[in-house]
């Protein structure tokens, strides 16, 4: 088991694991400190470097989203099972989810690039993995992350977004993101929602 905020098992042991469970018990520490309602609990099951199950509990909204890499997904809201929304309201704007506290110059440059392609862009500042939940539900369209983050910040969201018809791409290689690596740092990436993928 790999958890944020605790020491990792040494890599020469972890690299032999077929499965690893990656947990972030408090994703969005600043959101928690400022009590703005945008912190989450993330959990992902990784098989041979690929996330196969993801769950995000958006605590203050009383919302739990879960998905399997096979595409099966679900949502629980305030203790009741609900239909997983798969398309937000239609918008002529490209809705880009960015970090409320950690937006980088490269992410702003990416937004400028989208504008240079002729898109009208609406920035949606959000905290923690609530960005990934909104992307999976179709409430935003793109989520770039070019600043530092760890595997436990990304893995669960990747499963949700891809199960909902979106795509996640490693911005350095154009390929997929691998998990349970030696340093556990995620590469820069872009998550695309179903509407734009």
Model features per residue range: what roles?
Residues 1-26, 109-112, 133, 173-175:
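N-terminal subdomain of lithium-sensitive/metallo-dependent phosphomonoesterases centered on the IMPase/IPPase/PAP
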Residues 108-117, 124, 130-197:
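Oxyanion/phosphate-interacting regions
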């Amino acid at each position: 088991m790999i958890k944020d905020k605790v020491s990792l098992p040494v890599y020469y042991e972890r690299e032999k694991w077929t499965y690893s469970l990656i947990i972030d018990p408090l994703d969005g520490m600043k959101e928690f400190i400022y009590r703005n309602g945008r912190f989450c609990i993330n959990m992902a099951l990784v098989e041979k470097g690929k996330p196969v199950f993801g769950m995000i509990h958006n605590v203050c909204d009383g919302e739990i989203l879960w998905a399997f890499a096979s595409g099966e997904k679900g949502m629980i809201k305030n203790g009741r099972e609900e239909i997983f929304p798969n398309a937000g309201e239609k918008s002529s704007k490209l809705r880009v989810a960015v970090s409320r506290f950690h937006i980088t110059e490269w992410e702003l440059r990416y937004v400028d690039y989208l504008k240079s392609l002729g898109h009208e862009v609406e920035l949606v500042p959000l905290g923690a993995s609530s960005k990934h939940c909104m992307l999976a539900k179709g409430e935003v369209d793109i989520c770039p992350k070019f600043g530092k983050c760890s595997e436990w910040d990304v893995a669960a969201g990747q499963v949700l977004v891809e199960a909902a018809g979106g795509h996640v791409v490693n911005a350095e290689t154009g390929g997929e993101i691998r998990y349970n690596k030696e340093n556990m740092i995620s590469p820069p990436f872009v998550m695309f929602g179903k509407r734009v993928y």
